[in-house]
Amino acid sequence: MKRLGAIIAGGKATRFGSDKAAAMLNGRPLIEHVADGLRSQVDKLIVCGRAWPEMDWIGDYPFPDMGPLGGLNAALHYAQQNGFDEVLTAGCDVVPVAQFPMERPDERAIYIDGHYLFGAWPVALAPVLQEHLRDQDNLSMRGWIAAIDAQAITLTQIFHNLNAPEQLSQYAAQQSNIGIR
């Protein structure tokens, strides 16, 4: 199976108050921590929704500023056009990155329970999502997951969604206390 990794990074970061992707964690931008976690699981890695130095990127599709579904839609279409079977997604603000199961009981899309941007999406969903997005009032990730009957999976790994500078500071302090740099 050929997998495309996509970091969803086109949000406005209103709760964070500044560019989350560029926020520093242990001396490196947050997006680079996410990229490191995805690289070992995919054949190619891209950033969706914004440019980032030294990484391939694509804009949201079909329009900018569509939120996570615009990034996922862009990634699915890119994957479809370039011979990938599946897209693994992660937000630019959640660490550490999940290790997705390689084998699953069926072909449904999966996402990590409580972390909707951590998902594995079959490329066959590209036209389905495109149709879903025709309704501009239907940009909810949760709504999309329900519409396609994606399967929630539970992992024992703990994730940290860093939506505010204070959360980033707390996470960095925890990492420092256990000797992670």
Which ranges hold each PLM region?
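C-terminal intrinsically disordered extensions
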Residues: 173-181
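Nucleotide and nucleotide-moiety/phosphate-recognizing core
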Residues: 1-138, 143-158, 165-166, 178-179
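Short amphipathic alpha-helices within nucleic acid-binding modules
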Residues: 167-173
